[in-house]
Amino acid sequence: MSTPARRRLMRDFKRMQQDPPSGVSASPLPDNVMKWNAVIIGPSDTPFEDGTFRLLLSFDEQYPNKPPQVKFISEMFHPNVYASGELCLDILQNRWSPTYDVSSILTSVQSLLNDPNISSPANVEAANLYKDHRSLYVKRVRETVENSWNDDDDEEEEEEDEDEAEDEDDDDDDNIDED
């Protein structure tokens, strides 16, 4: 069923494909245009450089009049990211405008990585390290970057484990005695 929100999301997707912003990518899930997977590459010359951070964007039928929920799936150590992965970003709350699209949301999140708002932290520990012990903050961020490279490996291992479990189940079926 085509709704204004779904039509707008398809326009956003088309724009992402025709004019992809640097360092970000996103696409709707194959079976649900209201949920998108996204990846942000950590900006050059920042502690986040070369990180590959996965996010999930969840839209409802109020989009673009209401912002999506944006959540890091990858581990993220940042003053404006809650432990749950949820973001504290003004354009996703009180400064939302229907003129924002998926591309502008992701580029805003990308720029937030190196320019946190420490006056309103979601992660107090990260904010305090950023303010008072920058070298420790950078060290923790670099660990997060390294972990982001393993996210894909973890997913592949989980898929392999699931495949092996299915194969074992198939073997068990072969051993059933029929009377």
Swiss-Prot record:
One of its GO terms (biological process) is mitotic G1 DNA damage checkpoint signaling. It comes from the Eukaryota. GO terms for cellular component: chromosome, telomeric region; cytoplasm; fungal biofilm matrix; HULC complex; MUB1-RAD6-UBR2 ubiquitin ligase complex; nucleus; Rad6-Rad18 complex; RAD6-UBR2 ubiquitin ligase complex. The active site is at 88 (glycyl thioester intermediate). PANTHER family: UBIQUITIN-CONJUGATING ENZYME E2 (PTHR24067). Residues 151-179 are annotated as: Acidic tail. Its EC number is 2.3.2.23. This is Ubiquitin-conjugating enzyme E2 2. Induction: Up-regulated by UV radiation, heat shock, osmotic stress and nitrogen starvation. Gene3D superfamilies: Ubiquitin Conjugating Enzyme. Residues 149-179 have a biased composition (Acidic residues). Catalyzes the covalent attachment of ubiquitin to other proteins. Plays a role in transcription regulation by catalyzing the monoubiquitination of histone H2B to form H2BK123ub1. H2BK123ub1 gives a specific tag for epigenetic transcriptional activation and is also a prerequisite for H3K4me and H3K79me formation. Also involved in postreplication repair of UV-damaged DNA, in N-end rule-dependent protein degradation and in sporulation.
